[in-house]
Curated annotation (Swiss-Prot):
Residues 1-32, 299-398 are annotated as: Disordered. Transcription activator that plays a role in the regulation of cell expansion in leaf and cotyledons tissues. Component of a network formed by miR396, the GRFs and their interacting factors (GIFs) acting in the regulation of meristem function, at least partially through the control of cell proliferation. microRNA396-GRF1/GRF3 regulatory module acts as a developmental regulator in the reprogramming of root cells during cyst nematode infection, leading to the formation of the syncytium. Residues 144-188 form the WRC domain. The QLQ domain and WRC domain may be involved in protein-protein interaction and DNA-binding, respectively. This is Growth-regulating factor 3. The gene is GRF3. GO terms for biological process: DNA-templated transcription; negative regulation of cell population proliferation; regulation of DNA-templated transcription; regulation of nematode larval development; response to cold; response to gibberellin; response to nematode; root development.
Amino acid sequence: MDLQLKQWRSQQQQQHQTESEEQPSAAKIPKHVFDQIHSHTATSTALPLFTPEPTSSKLSSLSPDSSSRFPKMGSFFSWAQWQELELQALIYRYMLAGAAVPQELLLPIKKSLLHLSPSYFLHHPLQHLPHYQPAWYLGRAAMDPEPGRCRRTDGKKWRCSRDVFAGHKYCERHMHRGRNRSRKPVETPTTVNATATSMASSVAAAATTTTATTTSTFAFGGGGGSEEVVGQGGSFFFSGSSNSSSELLHLSQSCSEMKQESNNMNNKRPYESHIGFSNNRSDGGHILRPFFDDWPRSSLQEADNSSSPMSSATCLSISMPGNSSSDVSLKLSTGNEEGARSNNNGRDQQNMSWWSGGGSNHHHHNMGGPLAEALRSSSSSSPTSVLHQLGVSTQAFH
């Protein structure tokens, strides 16, 4: 094996010597010349960024022989690349000195960039730098192959087939796709209408409750707890289940209107205009019309004349034998009103309090009423005899 290797080596050396003798001119050419020729042919096609255009006077000194001044670097750069390197070095010196770069140094760079094809910038590794991009390059949005078509894809591979809306990049269907909005407009009701309807409903409800409570109170005297409502003309007692302040205010207004109507009806007949006398029956169901028809009306007129219009409260007292002062009094607040109105209101309040005496909270009203007015106004008749006659007449009805 060793002999065979030695023979093969000797044969190779002989062949190499014979080839070198046949080509003597190739051995005389220096090595750096081959490298320069090879690099010129390889880099001229790989870097077509700048073209040699020596138009200015400052670039006249740059020539192909300039590489001979730098024999070590001439083998690594072509003539065009060396010229561009000196141009960039000169621009860099202006920038370091803080002076303005002359326009004639920048014109060759602009011309070389404009003559290049657009496909070079789409795949250039330095396209993210703005100073390497031409003026017409506006990014990916300007590269729309179909500018008049809607750009919405809806998560698919193909685009929408409709045309874009005027001034937008989507069609009319996809223009509002990304917005968060409700499909139906929400109408907010105004507070004025809501308050007006609530007030109207509360007034209607208060009117119905007022009629119901007044009817039950006047006709049957009210069996539950009593409350006092102050109206415009005076006050009276009623029984009901509502305790809210808003209903009390509505009740007071409605009661004042009812009081005015009752005043007009009292001018014709004092005791038949009330709700309790409309059915002509008492709490036990007995007829009381003959008793009140026989009652003298002169005593009632004297009682109305005796009440003073300036008094703030009307007191009804019953004088018992042996007592000079009144033991039982009925308190009715009439307020400071005019003379004619206070007479009518006082008479209404006395009648109402007389009928409300059937409740559990007004035990001392049982001995009052129109009989007390008549007994107080007439001095000729005896209170005890009249009360005795009243008890006999009520027993006869029973």
